[in-house]
A protein has these predicted regions:
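Glycan-recognition and catalytic cores of secretory/periplasmic carbohydrate-active enzymes
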Residues: 1-222
Length: 222
């Protein structure tokens, strides 16, 4: 869900004239805000500055046993969280990316909301960076359905570069480049998915730095 919100915002940021000409920009912002409002509610540690984020509501096996409307499932709905003792760097960093990209989409339209999104994004990225771990190791019910196959390194780069774009803070760009090099990401990738953000990170790094090593990888993307 966080990955979907990031990509929706990215589309609006990259092609605003297309959305405006189609009369769809307001609909796009509404769709993104539906997701980011939810993420803000899930970030339950925000008021105290603690690391606590609810990453899943519902049991996978139980939910998949019924293909009906949520309104017709007033049954067992357990909730699962990540926190300082049970981290989820991939989930926290991806959510930070979604909030940061959404802040850019709302910049100049609802500045108070954009600022709120940045505040939550920065806390979540700190959580991801300081308490390392795969979310599916902490929320074990997710393993059979949305396991973090690729780990969290790509999301740490992805989240940092989005925060740089949204805030202009050099520390985030420095961190994105440092982690990109540290994690050995200097090779081409074949796809962008909810679990693998390397291709997207390479695009953003190429745009923000203009460095040939990032640009070259995009010319051979396949």
């Amino acid at each position: 869900m966080a990955g979907a919100m990031t990509l929706l915002s990215w589309g609006g940021i990259s092609y605003p004239q297309g959305y405006e000409k189609a009369g769809m920009m307001d609909y796009l912002r509404d769709a993104v805000k539906w997701g980011t409002d939810y993420f803000i509610k899930c970030n339950t540690g925000y008021d105290t500055g603690e690391y606590e984020f609810y990453g899943q509501v519902g049991n996978g096996d139980f939910d998949h046993s019924s293909w009906s409307r949520p309104e017709e499932m007033p049954d067992w709905r357990p909730s699962y969280k990540i926190d300082a003792s049970n981290p989820g760097s991939d989930l926290a960093a991806e959510t930070a990316a979604s909030l940061a990209s959404a802040a850019m989409l709302f910049d100049g339209v609802d500045d108070a909301y954009a600022a709120e999104l940045i505040d939550h994004a920065e806390l979540l990225y700190s959580f991801a960076d300081e308490r390392r771990g795969k979310y599916s190791d902490s929320i074990t019910d997710a393993y059979a359905f949305y396991n973090s196959w690729g780990g969290y390194n790509d999301e740490l780069v992805w989240g940092a570069i989005w925060l740089y774009k949204a805030t202009g803070k050099q520390e985030y760009l420095d961190k994105a480049i440092s982690y990109y090099d540290q994690f050995g990401f200097g090779s081409k990738t074949q796809f962008l998915s909810w679990d693998d953000k390397l291709a997207g990170a390479q695009v953003l790094l190429a745009q923000e730095t203009g460095e040939s090593r990032f640009v070259q990888l995009l010319t051979i993307f396949s």
